[in-house]
Amino acid sequence: MVEKIRIIGIDPGLRRTGWGIIDFLGNHMHFVASGTLHSDAQLNLASRLHQLHKGLSEVVHQFMPHEAAVEHVFVNKDATATLKLGQARAIALLVPAQAGLPVFEYAPNTIKKSVIGVGHGAKEQIHMMVKRLLPRAEFDGHDAADALALVICHSAHRTNFAHRIKG
């Protein structure tokens, strides 16, 4: 009997954190839900991080995934922005870990290569492929679509790892 695995993907950001959930039953993918959490830019950093923590905790509690995949941050020229993104990413790692989930991390180029076949591509290409692989998927923006792409990436790596163990 094939076991259903539910995976959440998290695309962290201080302004917007995308999330997407897909069920896997054997080789079949089934879209469950996706969305974008927003933090209030008028609040201080601690309050914004709290908003993200609370929102992501509610998503994990509601959908009860088995595994989580989180995107690695990229370093840019603005050190302050990179630091804030890193703090939002810490929330994205912490929430599933607190729920007892194994957490996996993927670089943006790895995600793109898994979804569209090359490590460099436009967001539109990724979103088009997510829609092709998950025709019933609904996402409210780039961040949620990226989170779904992250789940697809993790499922490919998860499957390859399982085959290596069996072989």
Swiss-Prot record:
The entry's localization annotation reads: Cytoplasm
Superkingdom field: Bacteria
- List of residues binding Mg(2+) 1: D11, D143
Tell me the keywords, alphabetical order: Cytoplasm, DNA damage, DNA recombination, DNA repair, DNA-binding, Endonuclease, Hydrolase, Magnesium, Metal-binding, Nuclease
What EC class is this? hydrolase
Please share the entry's free-text remark on the cofactor.
Answer: Binds 2 Mg(2+) ion per subunit.
Q: What is its main location?
A: cytoplasm
Q: What's an example GO BP annotation here?
A: DNA recombination
Pfam families, from UniProt? RuvC (PF02075)
GO molecular function terms listed in the Swiss-Prot or TrEMBL record = crossover junction DNA endonuclease activity; DNA binding; magnesium ion binding
Please list the residues that bind Mg(2+) 2: E71
Its UniProt entry gives the catalysed reaction(s) as: Endonucleolytic cleavage at a junction such as a reciprocal single-stranded crossover between two homologous DNA duplexes (Holliday junction)
Identify the catalytic residues. D11, E71, D143
Keyword Metal-binding assigned: yes
Under InterPro entries, the record lists: RNaseH-like_sf, RNaseH_sf, X-over_junc_endoDNase_RuvC
Q: Which cofactors does the annotated protein need, by name?
A: Mg(2+)
Instruction: Extract the NCBIfam families matched here.
Output: ruvC
Family designation: Belongs to the RuvC family.
Protein name, UniProt field: Crossover junction endodeoxyribonuclease RuvC
Native source organism of the sequence: Bartonella bacilliformis (strain ATCC 35685 / KC583 / Herrer 020/F12,63)
High-level lineage: Bacteria, Pseudomonadati, Pseudomonadota, Alphaproteobacteria, Hyphomicrobiales
Q: Which gene encodes it?
A: ruvC
